[in-house]
């Protein structure tokens, strides 16, 4: 049996302001730093240790990982960063307040943009300053790989090849792996692992800063999964995520 731990980064400054973030490189809020620290302490108390870690190229995930590894006294382990673990690209919605967007377009439309598997938000133009092609961290990507907007399926289509080519073989080799990423890149991975339907994934929220453990068989098929937190805390944090797209959302 193998175990892999998935962790959504702690609350970011734009999570705090209830804004669509996507590929915007926003740092952790003070609360997010504390969430990351608590995650590290929880993993340490539960006896978890890691041989290597995977994360995105966005600082809110990277910093969460740093803090967790610091708590575990494992800052020396190899860390692999890939744009394929980035948050879903929210197109022209990036930077907009979710509650104000719900007021303008309706809560149902915002829920569809945020949660559906196959609907893309309005796209960026290539001359928009927010276009990732202007960012040096994506200099090695082809124009086709750089998104103007993404739905969840698009996100899955970049996450899963990285899982299959790089992360899965690492787990199969016997290494203990930690993945620190984002709400939608992790939702995509969970959809793949648990073979969830489009409707099931639309209702799935992953809370910030709570380790999610997957126990996998030798073929990396899930045996079971669980959060390292009590049910009430998980429920409360999931509701915070869900309420972000509502007119009164203020998470």
UniProtKB/Swiss-Prot annotation:
Positions with a binding annotation for substrate: 8-15, 21-22, 60, 87-90, 98, 114-115, 183-184
Keyword Cell membrane belongs to the record: no
Listed PROSITE patterns: PG_MUTASE
GO biological process terms, semicolon-separated: gluconeogenesis; glycolytic process
InterPro entries the record matches: His_Pase_superF_clade-1, His_PPase_superfam, PG/BPGM_mutase_AS, Phosphogly_mut1
Entry annotated with the keyword Isomerase: yes
Recorded catalytic activity of this chain's protein: (2R)-2-phosphoglycerate = (2R)-3-phosphoglycerate
MF terms in GO: phosphoglycerate mutase activity
Positions of the catalytic residues: 9 (tele-phosphohistidine intermediate), 87 (proton donor/acceptor)
Pathway, per record: Carbohydrate degradation; glycolysis; pyruvate from D-glyceraldehyde 3-phosphate: step 3/5
CDD domains hit by this protein: HP_PGM_like (cd07067)
Site positions per UniProt: Transition state stabilizer: 182
Family statement drawn from the similarity comment of this UniProt entry: Belongs to the phosphoglycerate mutase family. BPG-dependent PGAM subfamily.
Function: Catalyzes the interconversion of 2-phosphoglycerate and 3-phosphoglycerate.
Protein name: 2,3-bisphosphoglycerate-dependent phosphoglycerate mutase
Protein source organism: Thermoanaerobacter sp. (strain X514)
